[in-house]
């Protein structure tokens, strides 16, 4: 069984998912996120850290697929396993399978809208963009509730299938 050495997330909502998955996997690693971490910075940091990881360690990143030309990077560099009707993907980095991405398509808000029927309009989406990390995670737990936990369990089970713990 491979262990996870680092977990990175692109935004607060992605961080909430990352923390819940890490807990489910029994990981004792802190999820790293700063307000400056967009998708490209998360990927760049993960690639840099990969060079210094032990052979049995993995990095998990929680990112958005995005729209338009920026999707190409994901398409070219990750082997994708689709979940939730192609709205969520678990991607294994083609150049180094120790980097695994959980990818929301096209973004976390779009994924939640399609799967839960929430966060579809701009006012609701703002709830995921303001306040502290704790407030955003509490918002997700309260509004999405049981569905949030099911999504976390599905992601966790998929990661276990590819032997990540």
Question: What function would you assign to each model-found segment?
Answer:
Residues 1-2, 16-32, 44-60, 65-165:
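C-terminal accessory helical subdomains adjacent to catalytic cores in phosphodiester-
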Residues 35-39:
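Conserved helicase motor
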Residues 1-12:
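A short, flexible N-terminal coil/short beta segment enriched in small residues
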């Amino acid at each position: 069984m491979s262990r996870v050495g680092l977990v990175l997330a692109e935004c607060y909502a992605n961080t909430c998912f990352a923390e819940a998955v890490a807990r489910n996997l029994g990981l004792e690693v802190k999820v790293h996120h700063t307000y400056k971490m967009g998708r490209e910075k998360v990927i760049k940091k993960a690639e840099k850290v990969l060079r210094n990881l032990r052979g049995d360690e993995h990095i998990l990143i929680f990112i958005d697929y995005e729209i338009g030309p920026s999707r190409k990077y994901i398409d070219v560099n990750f082997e994708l396993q689709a979940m939730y009707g192609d709205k969520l993907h678990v991607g294994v980095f083609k150049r180094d399978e120790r980097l695994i991405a959980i990818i929301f398509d096209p973004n976390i808000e779009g994924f939640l809208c399609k799967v839960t029927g929430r966060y579809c309009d701009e006012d609701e989406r703002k709830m995921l963009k303001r306040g502290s990390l704790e407030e955003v995670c509490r918002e997700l737990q309260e509004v999405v509730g049981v569905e949030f936990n099911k999504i976390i369990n599905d992601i966790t089970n998929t990661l276990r299938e590819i032997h990540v713990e």
